[in-house]
């Protein structure tokens, strides 16, 4: 397999499976379905997560101090929207290649187990303390107002911890315009950051206006690149309907208004991993075909003679169905781009593909941090 964390163009084989026992000639075809069902969606999530990370890299580089961490810009909020726990865990593990934050907490244990990591000593994944609508509604029912619970969160429940607070259970702008200013003393004395969390409405409009209002109430500083940064006691997290397009729109509008990208963090939900909205508004469903994830038989031995196997349907007008034939050599060209040469009659030993599993043994075991650094160019902050 090509080493995990490598960016691979469509059409370049990532995995090559070869049978090593003469009594199990068709084992490669049997295992093909199992491998695809386990791998394609985490691969797609890793790719989509990397797209968000590249976007974060761009806006952090333009508007934020260089020491800030773009891998904290987006969190995985998608667990409850996935088809099952196992899928949520595997896919959030893929997301954590690009970012450090997830609300799918079992993914952290999954990485600990399968990548010999230790979440107690390594920055594998970070969750967050956060309220939910049931918390806000229950306390409102008892107190008769929202301000009492906001103050209790700041002074009694989490006086020394950052937390997010869903803020639109009843009247979001009343929370921003009246309740938070009335709690300014408690917020500024709080040993942590309060992240307000809008959860409905027009994402771009609400996010940008919220940051402007918080700046007017709580102030902040101007960073080394000339962009405004909210006081560290206050911020915003948006986790409703995030897409690549509207996340970019938020950061772009903030940039135009002189605010740094790190004033807001995003919670990316399951919709973003199930469909991608293109700039023209067209929705593309995320399937195996989206990133060309498929496995095909390319080589066999019949009566001791090697044969090349391939498919090339005449009705395939998109030219995406034609497969490689024979054993493949994956290599880097002079520009460092991955290329494929096929037609070999034996497993190629000197290319990018390397043995990962053979005859019951694992080879080339790597840490999760090794894979992260490979994906992010060896420097997670650029």
Predicted stretch roles:
Residues 162-164, 193-197, 233-237, 263-267:
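Structural preference for beta-strand elements that scaffold enzyme active sites
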């Amino acid at each position: 397999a090509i080493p995990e964390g490598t960016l691979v163009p469509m059409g370049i084989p990532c995995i090559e499976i070869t049978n090593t026992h003469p009594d199990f000639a068709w084992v490669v075809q049997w295992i093909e379905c199992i491998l695809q069902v386990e791998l394609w969606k985490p691969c797609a999530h890793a790719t989509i997560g990397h797209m968000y990370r590249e976007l974060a890299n761009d806006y952090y580089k333009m508007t934020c101090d260089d020491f800030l961490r773009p891998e904290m810009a987006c969190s995985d909020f998608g667990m409850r929207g996935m088809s099952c726990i196992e899928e949520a865990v595997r896919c959030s593990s893929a997301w954590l290649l690009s970012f450090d934050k997830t609300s799918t907490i079992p993914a952290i244990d999954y990485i600990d187990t399968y990548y010999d990591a230790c979440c107690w000593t390594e920055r594998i994944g970070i969750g967050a303390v956060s309220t939910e609508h049931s918390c806000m509604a229950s306390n409102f029912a008892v107190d008769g107002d929202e301000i009492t619970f906001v103050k209790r969160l700041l002074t009694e429940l989490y006086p020394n911890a950052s937390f997010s607070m869903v803020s639109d259970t009843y009247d979001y702008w009343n929370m921003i315009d009246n309740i938070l200013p009335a709690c300014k003393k408690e917020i500024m004395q709080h040993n942590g950051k309060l992240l307000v969390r809008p959860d409905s409405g027009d994402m771009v409009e609400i996010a940008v206006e919220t940051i402007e209002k918080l700046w007017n109430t709580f102030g902040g500083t101007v960073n080394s690149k000339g962009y405004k940064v909210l006081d560290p006691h206050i911020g915003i997290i948006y986790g409703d309907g995030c897409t690549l397009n509207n996340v970019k729109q938020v950061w772009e509008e903030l940039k135009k208004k002189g605010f740094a990208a790190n004033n807001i963090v995003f919670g990316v939900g399951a919709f973003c991993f199930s469909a991608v909205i293109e700039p023209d508004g067209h929705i593309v469903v995320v399937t195996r075909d989206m990133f060309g994830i498929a496995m095909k038989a390319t080589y066999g031995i019949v009566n001791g003679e090697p044969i090349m196997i391939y498919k090339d349907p005449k009705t395939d007008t998109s030219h995406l169905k034609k497969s490689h034939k024979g054993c493949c050599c994956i290599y880097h060209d002079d520009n460092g781009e991955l290329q494929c040469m096929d037609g070999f009659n034996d497993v190629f030993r000197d290319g990018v593909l390397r043995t990962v599993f053979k005859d019951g043994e694992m080879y080339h075991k790597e840490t999760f941090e090794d894979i992260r650094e490979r994906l992010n160019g060896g420097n997670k902050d650029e």
